[in-house]
């Protein structure tokens, strides 16, 4: 017999922890650049009965019966994704960005082939060739990095390495890079050496959808993304590609990498894509960028050094070496003050990955709450105060109180706390 109790009755321990996490999100400043807050509609889809349905295969071609409804759900997600990004084909089944990237690699290359990608140490991602990741284990990775003069991507180096190594894939994208990615220039290099260009736009997908960052879709064989971050959907992945690659890519996801898709997550993706197709989403993305620029200037006014001097998108990297702080110390101190960031490697970082010399800061979540430039100036000052006295418990307590007061003016998930 099916249990009929609500969560609070059936499992009070988990219910309590969920309330505590919701309260943490509501009462603190969420500045992790890869995090965001989904809408109640997205949450509702995630918790729907679609979680019960197995649906191996694709709409109209399933290995299970009873898929007539989830076929419609998934097709809506596909159609909305294609409309949002102007793509020929979309696969909305990847459970995460890592699976999307794996499928892209497997569709275009064989193990042992050469991949030219941005080094994790300079802002890339684990799946762009880190030796501890499948990408670094299966492929020959040639990393590119930044110019020391301005801490932006060294396109001359990218071109030189491409000509020297003739990669099968040129992987473009980053997880900690605050400047515009010039996909047209990358495409010229890829075309010159006969490489297939793959773009991981996970961090900037929302900006791309709103036309605030150049789109990689016209220039790339394959584009991968997560569906959270700036896109403000559920945690998951997606692949966009030219029609010529559609069949191969689909087969790499299923049956190649995954089994049954998570149709409740796909429904939530469809809801988020629908939200992103509305005019107000563009205004939201404009606010993200404006907030990031104001926050960056505020942090510099507080005496902090930013990698590359600022930001063009939703995030910035703070170099803490002039403060004689590590990212680990800064993350912990800010956390005690109710400000959540993540420690992050900076270019040419002398510290280990679990220590780091920097922190990564982003504005998507605070922008979702409705905060604007005025609040960003205040947030920058609060961060500055904490980093000036990271071991002073009185300072941290005072800042935490101010953070809680600020958040109270921008309530979130009030019915769930």
From Swiss-Prot:
> What GO biological process terms does the UniProt entry carry, in alphabetical order?
glycine biosynthetic process from serine; tetrahydrofolate interconversion
User: What's the domain of life for this entry?
Assistant: Bacteria
Question: Where would you say this protein principally sits, based on its record?
Answer: cytoplasm
What species is given as this protein's source? Answer: Anaeromyxobacter dehalogenans (strain 2CP-C)
Q: Name one GO cellular component term.
A: cytosol
Residues with N6-(pyridoxal phosphate)lysine modification: 229
Pathway it works in: One-carbon metabolism; tetrahydrofolate interconversion; Amino-acid biosynthesis; glycine biosynthesis; glycine from L-serine: step 1/1
Please give one Gene Ontology molecular function term for this protein.
Answer: pyridoxal phosphate binding
What the protein does?
Answer: Catalyzes the reversible interconversion of serine and glycine with tetrahydrofolate (THF) serving as the one-carbon carrier. This reaction serves as the major source of one-carbon groups required for the biosynthesis of purines, thymidylate, methionine, and other important biomolecules. Also exhibits THF-independent aldolase activity toward beta-hydroxyamino acids, producing glycine and aldehydes, via a retro-aldol mechanism.
How does this polypeptide assemble, per the annotation?
A: Homodimer.
Please verify whether the record's keywords include Acetylation: no
Q: Name one Pfam family in it.
A: SHMT
| The name this protein goes by in its record | Serine hydroxymethyltransferase
Name the residues annotated as site: Plays an important role in substrate specificity: 228
The family database entries (InterPro entries) matched by this protein are listed as: PyrdxlP-dep_Trfase, PyrdxlP-dep_Trfase_major, PyrdxlP-dep_Trfase_small, Ser_HO-MeTrfase, Ser_HO-MeTrfase-like, Ser_HO-MeTrfase_PLP_BS, SHMT-like_dom
Q: Where in the cell is it found?
A: Cytoplasm
Q: Which cofactor does it need?
A: pyridoxal 5'-phosphate
Write the record's keywords in alphabetical order, separated by commas.
Amino-acid biosynthesis, Cytoplasm, One-carbon metabolism, Pyridoxal phosphate, Transferase
Name of the coding gene: glyA
Q: CDD domains, from UniProt? A: SHMT
Catalytic activity annotation:
(6R)-5,10-methylene-5,6,7,8-tetrahydrofolate + glycine + H2O = (6S)-5,6,7,8-tetrahydrofolate + L-serine
Annotated (6S)-5,6,7,8-tetrahydrofolate binding lies at: 120, 124-126
């Amino acid at each position: 017999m099916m249990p009929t109790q609500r969560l609070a009755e059936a499992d009070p321990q988990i219910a309590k922890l969920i309330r505590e996490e919701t309260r943490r999100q509501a009462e603190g400043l969420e500045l992790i650049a890869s995090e965001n807050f989904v809408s109640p509609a997205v949450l509702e889809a995630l918790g729907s009965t679609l979680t019960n349905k197995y649906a191996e295969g694709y709409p109209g071609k399933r290995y299970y019966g009873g898929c007539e409804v989830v076929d419609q759900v998934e097709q809506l997600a596909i159609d909305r994704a294609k409309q949002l990004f102007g793509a020929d084909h979309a696969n909305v089944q990847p459970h995460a960005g890592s699976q999307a990237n794996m499928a892209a690699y497997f569709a275009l290359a064989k193990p042992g082939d050469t991949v030219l990608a941005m080094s994790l140490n300079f802002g890339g991602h684990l799946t762009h060739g880190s030796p501890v990741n499948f990408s670094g284990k299966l492929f020959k990775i040639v990393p590119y990095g930044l110019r020391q003069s301005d801490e932006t991507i060294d396109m001359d180096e990218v071109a030189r390495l491409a000509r020297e190594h003739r990669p099968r894939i040129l992987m473009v994208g980053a997880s900690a890079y605050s400047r515009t990615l010039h996909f047209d220039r990358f495409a010229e290099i890829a075309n010159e050496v006969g490489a297939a260009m793959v773009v991981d736009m996970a961090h900037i997908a929302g900006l791309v959808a709103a036309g605030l960052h150049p789109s990689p879709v016209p220039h790339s064989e394959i584009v991968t993304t997560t569906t959270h971050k700036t896109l403000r959907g559920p945690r998951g992945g997606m692949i966009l590609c030219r029609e010529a690659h559609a069949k191969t890519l689909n087969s790499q996801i299923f049956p190649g990498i995954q089994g049954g898709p998570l149709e409740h997550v796909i429904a939530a993706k469809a809801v988020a894509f629908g939200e992103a197709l509305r005019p107000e989403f563009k205004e939201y993305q404009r606010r993200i960028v404006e907030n990031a620029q104001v926050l960056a200037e505020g942090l510099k006014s507080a005496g902090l050094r930013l990698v590359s001097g600022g930001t063009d998108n939703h995030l910035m990297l703070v170099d803490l070496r002039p403060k004689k702080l590590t990212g680990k110390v800064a993350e912990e101190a800010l956390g005690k003050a109710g400000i959540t960031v993540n420690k992050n490697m900076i270019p040419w970082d002398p510290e280990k990955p679990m220590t780091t010399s920097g922190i990564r800061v982003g504005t998507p979540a605070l922008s979702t709450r409705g905060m604007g430039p005025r609040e960003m100036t205040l947030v920058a000052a609060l961060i500055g105060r904490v980093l000036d006295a990271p071991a002073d418990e009185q300072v941290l307590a005072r800042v935490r109180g101010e953070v809680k007061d600020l958040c109270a003016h921008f309530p979130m998930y009030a019915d769930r706390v």
